Amino acid sequence: MMKRLLIANRGEIACRIIRTAKRTGIQSVAVFSDADAGALHVRMADAAVHIGPSAVSESYLRGDAIIAAALESGADAIHPGFGFLSENAQFAKAVIDAGLIWVGPDPASIEAMGLKDAAKTLMAEAGVPVTPGYMGADQSPDTLAAAAGEIGYPVLIKAIAGGGGKGMRKVETGAEFASALQSCQREAKGAFGDDRVLLEKYVTRPRHIEVQVFGDKHGNVVHLFERDCSLQRRHQKVIEEAPAPGMDEATRAAICEAAVKAAHAVDYVGAGTIEFIADASGGLRADRIWFMEMNTRLQVEHPVTEAITGVDLVEWQLRIASGETLPKSQEQLSFSGWAMEARLYAEDPAHAFMPSTGTLEIFELPDGVRVETGVEAGDAITPFYDPMIAKLIVHGPTRAIAAKRLSRLELHVFVKVSDHAHGGAFVHHRL
């Protein structure tokens, strides 16, 4: 087992990893930027190393600085968390080449699933159902327009290297296609440095279903059932739940089997999520659920899976990265009850939900609910990072009870962020 773990991240996920490390007897090392010098993850860790200025490009995205911090602090392993460098195959390889344990999948697996067109081709070859669409190398406007006509409108244009809701355009008719394509390509080039796109049939009544998978270094893969992340805002998840409502056992078996097959296709090691899109116009059916992409890291919404299975996914990550076999076989895994997670953002609803910055003057959360956060009252909310400040997770015997518990939180969550330059901004988390 590793002895000293550096967490190449910040905020709530860094704090969450540190807690599991402490519980399992592993020392933790935090990294921090100028803006995060007094952050909660720095205060919680056994040691902390400064890695650069506040901008992520000069700190949390500096793989060389992070590896140097690990070596300087005596860490023998690096956990990337999610976001930042967590799905960067070159960083993963550099960590391994430096003689450190990489808490994540093999760089080749990250690379294989990193480009959406290649990933879909690989999945189709492995027998995993994929969304009808175009993933060809010919990116000429005429070829793409012709492919869209063959798929049938509406279609979705997606950046091959996309993510986080960027580089996506829904197109209703052929007359709109050319301008939508140009807009999508411009955004993709600016955000990812790659303007290539793929086309998918747009599902008019979509459900976003994802399956948690885990693989070890001995060729074993299991699934930990599904999550539903259909409630989104600007293509980003807002409320997640597990299991998925309306999922019968036959459909669950089919989608989970497809997810395990996908993981085996890339010799997957560690925590991963296979994302599917379902056409729910006639209910959830196995023949109307298609592979969308694979996230080769821990997901933001992993706590809902932990709540229904009783498994600490971060502990599994640490054990598997250390060379252990999966702690449980598929037959030993089961779930009970229902879990829901809501994300709490420091945003100002009076100003188009723009991020609120300043001092977190009030941060009162209810007892009896799992809270994952990277801040405490008195901490600074800066403009440099994602405005998500906490996740609230509830569990109940049924979906109705879990939803009721989540909705009641509205009366017990009080957050005030004071922006001294622009006056006070109140954020009330409404469920």
Predicted regions: what they are:
Residues M1-I274, A278-H302:
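N-terminal beta-alpha lobe that positions the nucleotide/phosphoryl donor
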Residues M168, E240, E341, M388-V394:
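Short, hydrophobic beta-strand segments
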Residues S183, K217-M247, T296-G323, S356-T373, ...:
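Extended active-site and interfacial segments that coordinate phosphate-rich ligands
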Residues C184-Q185, V197-L198, H208-V211, A259-K261, ...:
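Glycine-rich, charged/polar anion/phosphate-binding loops
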Residues G246-F276, N295-P349, L431:
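Active-site "cap" helix and flanking loop/linker of ATP-utilizing ligase/carboxylase catalytic domains
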Residues L326, E331-Y385:
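Glycine-rich active-site loop/lid that clamps phosphate-bearing ligands
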Residues L392-E410:
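Short, well-ordered alpha-helical segments
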Residues R408-E410, F414-L431:
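A short N-terminal helical cap/helix-turn-helix that marks the beginning
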